Amino acid sequence: MERNPGATPLLVRKGVRRGCVANELSRPGRRAVMMGLGAAAALIPGAHAAGGLARLTLWPDLPPGGGGPSGPQVEDGSGAVSNVSTPVLEVFLPQKPSGAAVLVAGGGGYRRIGLVKEAYPAAYLLASQGITAFVLTYRLPSENWADGPVVAMQDGQRALRVIRANAERFGLDPGRIGVMGFSAGGHLCGMVAARSTFRAYTPVDAVDELSARPDFAALIYPVVSLQPPFDTTNTRRSLVGETPPPEARAAWSLHTHVGPDCPSIFLVQADDDRVVNPQQSRILDEACRGAKVMVEYHRFAVGGHGFGIGSAEASVALWPRLYRLWLTSLSVMR
């Protein structure tokens, strides 16, 4: 029997709306909120401690792509997940919705997805600012999918369509729906933004008649290029293998797809990033400017890789405030 993405039951947790984690909260404060979520979740069948207020299944039946992992989804000690066979969206509702929404994708080299360290904190921060956040658990290309690297894009495109299909339900403006990705999640969100006309899968229902183009995109220390000398990342290994031909490297390099239809981009990276060469963000910045795509690029001297929404001890903690100002300049926040 087909499941309508708009018919997923809403899981409401006591205190969650009041417990949105803002960037200014201390570490003990964040921990207390997460513990409170755990206690509330225990009262609700099917709920889990770290997630959102609703869960939306992306696909009405088995996802496209063929194959996939066996066994249950796995979560490691850091809160990153892998062995994903059922991609989902978790919804974080603001107390005072602005009508804007953001799809959030954590990183992990397309080998796992950083939910607890990247995606969930970003989602709570967005919700605290009136933005409905949708955290995407996407399929990982390295987990035996016949469609290989395309499966993550299938989930990214479908996620944006499912969000638009649920716009009325969650009080959203279909013209103010963006994406935010970290590291490999930044690569995914960037590819979805730059290749919105690419059909990653055959339509399965009426939801696929909706647009998969985000209206704005935030890419935080993203993987951009899979070409030498920037081909040392797990993202490259997961997407195109150990010895890919040049055309495969180019096809999955984000900057090669930037064109006039690409939405405005907000770009953040630290100059001391030892995982993703900071030159990658500069390449993307240049590609956007060359294609006359509006781009705002913020370089921080110190921050490394994987700083998420930042900590009070480092200047990278400023980027969420800059992001909000950027959204205001785009009239996303009104």
Language-model segments: which ranges?
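N-terminal secretory signal peptides
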Residues: 1-28, 39-41
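Mobile cap/lid helix-loop segments that gate and shape the active-site cleft of serine hydrolases
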Residues: 73-78, 206, 222-257, 263
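Short beta-strand element of the alpha/beta-hydrolase
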Residues: 99-107
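Catalytic nucleophile-loop/oxyanion-hole region of alpha/beta-hydrolase
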Residues: 114-122, 136-174, 311-316
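Primarily recognizes the serine-hydrolase "nucleophile elbow" in alpha/beta-hydrolase
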Residues: 158-231, 249
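Short beta-strand/loop motif that positions the catalytic acidic residue
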Residues: 267-269
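Acidic catalytic loop of the alpha/beta-hydrolase fold
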Residues: 272-276
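C-terminal catalytic histidine-bearing segment of alpha/beta-hydrolase fold enzymes
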Residues: 278, 282-334
